[in-house]
C-alpha cells in the first residue's frame, strides 16, 4: 500500500521521479554539474569557421598571372605544360 500511496502523491512516471520533477529544464541543459558533479561541456557558439578564403583579384593576378608566369623559368614551364595539355586558359 505504501508503493501505491507514494505513486499517488508523487510524480506519475519513473523518469519524472528520477529528474526530481524538473522535466521542463534538466540541469544538464543549463550547464550546471550533472549527477556526478562534473560540469557539462558547453557547445562553442559564435566561433566563425570556413571564412579563411577571402578572394582578392589583385593577389590572384600577381601570383598566377601571365606576367608572373613568364618572369621565371618555372613559370614558363607551367605555361608550356598547360599548352601541351590543351588548356583553354593558360594563366589568370
Swiss-Prot record:
Protein name (database record): Large ribosomal subunit protein bL34m
Has keyword Mitochondrion?
A: yes
- Transit peptide, residues from-to: 1-46
Q: Spell out the GO cellular component terms annotated for this protein, sorted alphabetically and separated by semicolons.
A: mitochondrial inner membrane; mitochondrial large ribosomal subunit; mitochondrial ribosome; mitochondrion
What is the similarity comment for this entry?
Belongs to the bacterial ribosomal protein bL34 family.
The record's Gene3D superfamilies line, in alphabetical order, gives: 1.10.287.3980
- Give the chief site where it resides: mitochondrion
The record describes its quaternary structure and partners as: Component of the mitochondrial large ribosomal subunit (mt-LSU). Mature mammalian 55S mitochondrial ribosomes consist of a small (28S) and a large (39S) subunit. The 28S small subunit contains a 12S ribosomal RNA (12S mt-rRNA) and 30 different proteins. The 39S large subunit contains a 16S rRNA (16S mt-rRNA), a copy of mitochondrial valine transfer RNA (mt-tRNA(Val)), which plays an integral structural role, and 52 different proteins.
Keyword terms? Mitochondrion, Phosphoprotein, Ribonucleoprotein, Ribosomal protein, Transit peptide
Membrane-crossing residues?
Answer: none
Q: Which PANTHER family match?
A: LARGE RIBOSOMAL SUBUNIT PROTEIN BL34M, MITOCHONDRIAL RIBOSOMAL PROTEIN 34 FAMILY MEMBER
Amino acid at each position: 500500500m505504501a508503493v501505491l500511496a507514494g505513486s499517488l502523491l508523487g510524480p506519475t512516471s519513473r523518469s519524472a521521479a528520477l529528474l526530481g520533477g524538473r522535466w521542463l529544464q534538466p540541469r544538464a541543459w543549463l550547464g550546471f554539474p550533472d549527477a556526478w558533479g562534473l560540469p557539462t561541456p558547453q557547445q562553442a557558439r559564435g566561433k566563425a569557421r570556413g571564412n579563411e578564403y577571402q578572394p582578392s583579384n589583385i593577389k590572384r593576378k600577381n601570383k598566377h598571372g601571365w606576367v608572373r608566369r613568364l618572369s621565371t623559368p618555372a613559370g614558363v614551364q607551367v605555361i608550356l605544360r598547360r599548352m601541351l595539355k590543351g588548356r583553354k586558359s593558360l594563366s589568370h
